[in-house]
């Protein structure tokens, strides 16, 4: 029986391994945890979420919602698990982290054609079909081998993880429930600040003691996961137009709008833990307690998880990969996940499905396929394989990646609806083409 190595038991690796297994292909899935830990993983589970517990919007006419619909057409394992681990989060699809990772692990272990190898991979096997899905925390040894294979220096920047707080330590007399603009159910907890409270918080934040490491001014951060203190340094109102924007959040029983608002999102099914939305940070733990407790409602906050920084590694995909995710220099190697330069949980998982599809087709001697550029997945693959290699930066799913409608549609809501309808038709065609 033919075999594929899948290196990395994260979101992309699990999707790739599962797809291959469903096609009757033997898989060796390599995961270095718990033999070798990372700076942010807490368990040995497959598919562990280490940043937010939100998989972003599930609204059908959004880019993130469309991405999920496309993945469901392709038989996504992770979205099936996510539905079973879902927690209230308004229009977003958020999950209980532990339950989600447990379900993913169970599904993989239940596949008889998948052999789970709990070992670190230092070198990509020579002469064997492999999918590299080692993620943002690729080990130094494997990163060195990838540099040898690709002839390129990997690019590094630093993602930041937001703190999580015990629900019973929150002062609910100062906090109100609501979702922005009333979309979905009122699943978010909102901590309103007046101008004086915000300015005090802001001054403390920009003068916070930051963990030692790479210069905060020289580090590269992807905007979707930028540390709050870095956002704050861009200007006094940067947070108020970012994660602390008050628009669409009316204080119950008051005609006055808050000057700024911190949102908290439920992270577990029991509702005992809430995460600070958009407040990834690299502050020292003591500083996190001191500064975040300045926010009304968080004065006695018990932090069950502090914000931390971790490295993200990704390759120069425009130089190295075809849209099929096959390596140009080594055709027996495919890449998937954040290491390809996609950003986001579902984006990473989607590339795992595509890598699995094309690894299977390569084994079978069939032509490699990618979804049409009018699909979100196809547009992402086109972006990472055809962008300028001189200043390549990670990208997440958004409608701006899609080709314009012909003729143009001026009304945004109608345009987005047209994008979705066109994409779903194209993804349906792609799914049918896989039968050949």
UniProtKB/Swiss-Prot annotation:
The gene is trmFO. This is Methylenetetrahydrofolate--tRNA-(uracil-5-)-methyltransferase TrmFO. Its EC number is 2.1.1.74. GO terms for molecular function: flavin adenine dinucleotide binding; tRNA (uracil(54)-C5)-methyltransferase activity, 5,10-methylenetetrahydrofolate-dependent. Belongs to the MnmG family. TrmFO subfamily. The keyword Cell membrane does not apply. Gene3D superfamilies: FAD/NAD(P)-binding domain. It is found in: Cytoplasm. Its cofactor is FAD. Keywords: Cytoplasm, FAD, Flavoprotein, Methyltransferase, NAD, NADP, Transferase, tRNA processing. InterPro entries: FAD/NAD-bd_sf, MnmG-rel, MnmG-rel_CS, MnmG_N, TrmFO. It comes from Syntrophomonas wolfei subsp. wolfei (strain DSM 2245B / Goettingen). Its main location: cytoplasm. It holds the Pfam family GIDA. It catalyses: uridine(54) in tRNA + (6R)-5,10-methylene-5,6,7,8-tetrahydrofolate + NADH + H(+) = 5-methyluridine(54) in tRNA + (6S)-5,6,7,8-tetrahydrofolate + NAD(+); uridine(54) in tRNA + (6R)-5,10-methylene-5,6,7,8-tetrahydrofolate + NADPH + H(+) = 5-methyluridine(54) in tRNA + (6S)-5,6,7,8-tetrahydrofolate + NADP(+). It comes from the Bacteria. Catalyzes the folate-dependent formation of 5-methyl-uridine at position 54 (M-5-U54) in all tRNAs. One of its GO terms (biological process) is tRNA wobble uridine modification.
């Amino acid at each position: 029986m033919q075999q594929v190595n899948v290196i990395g038991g994260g979101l992309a690796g699990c999707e790739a391994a599962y797809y291959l297994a469903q096609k009757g292909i033997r898989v060796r899935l390599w995961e270095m945890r718990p033999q070798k830990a990372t700076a942010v993983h807490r368990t040995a589970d497959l598919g562990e979420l280490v940043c937010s517990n939100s998989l972003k919007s599930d609204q059908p006419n959004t880019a993130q919602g469309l991405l999920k619909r496309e993945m469901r057409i392709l038989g996504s394992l992770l979205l099936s698990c996510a539905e079973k681990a879902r927690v209230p989060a308004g229009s977003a699809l958020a999950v209980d982290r532990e339950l989600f990772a447990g379900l993913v692990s169970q599904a993989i272990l239940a596949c008889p054609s998948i052999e789970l190898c709990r070992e670190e991979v230092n070198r990509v096997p020579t002469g064997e079909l492999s999918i590299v899905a080692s993620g943002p925390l690729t080990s130094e040894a494997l990163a060195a081998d990838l540099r040898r294979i690709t002839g390129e220096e990997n690019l590094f920047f630093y993602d930041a993880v937001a703190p999580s707080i015990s629900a019973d330590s929150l002062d609910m007399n100062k906090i109100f429930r609501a979702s922005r603009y009333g979309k979905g159910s009122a699943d978010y907890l909102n901590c309103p600040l007046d101008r004086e409270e915000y300015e005090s918080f802001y001054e403390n934040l920009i003068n916070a003691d930051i963990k030692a490491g790479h210069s905060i001014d020289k580090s590269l951060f992807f905007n979707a996961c930028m540390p709050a203190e870095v956002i704050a340094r861009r200007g006094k109102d940067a947070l108020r137009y970012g994660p602390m924007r008050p628009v669409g959040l009316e204080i119950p029983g008051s005609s006055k709008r808050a000057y700024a608002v911190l949102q908290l999102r439920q992270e577990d099914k029991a509702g005992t833990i809430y995460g600070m939305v958009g407040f990834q940070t690299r502050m020292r733990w003591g500083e996190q307690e001191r500064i975040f407790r300045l926010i009304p409602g968080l004065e006695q906050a018990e932090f069950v998880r502090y914000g931390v920084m971790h490295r993200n590694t990704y390759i120069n995909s425009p130089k190295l990969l075809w849209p099929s995710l096959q390596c140009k220099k080594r055709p027996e190697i495919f890449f998937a996940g954040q290491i390809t330069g996609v950003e986001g949980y579902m984006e990473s998982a989607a590339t795992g499905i595509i890598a699995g599809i094309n690894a299977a087709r390569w084994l079978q001697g069939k032509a490699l396929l990618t979804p049409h550029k009018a699909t979100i997945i196809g547009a992402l693959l086109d972006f990472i394989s055809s962008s300028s290699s001189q200043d390549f930066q990670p990208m997440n799913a958004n409608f701006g990646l899609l080709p314009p409608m012909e003729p143009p549609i001026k009304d945004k809501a109608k345009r987005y609806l047209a994008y979705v309808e066109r994409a779903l038709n194209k993804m349906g065609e792609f799914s049918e083409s896989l039968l050949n």
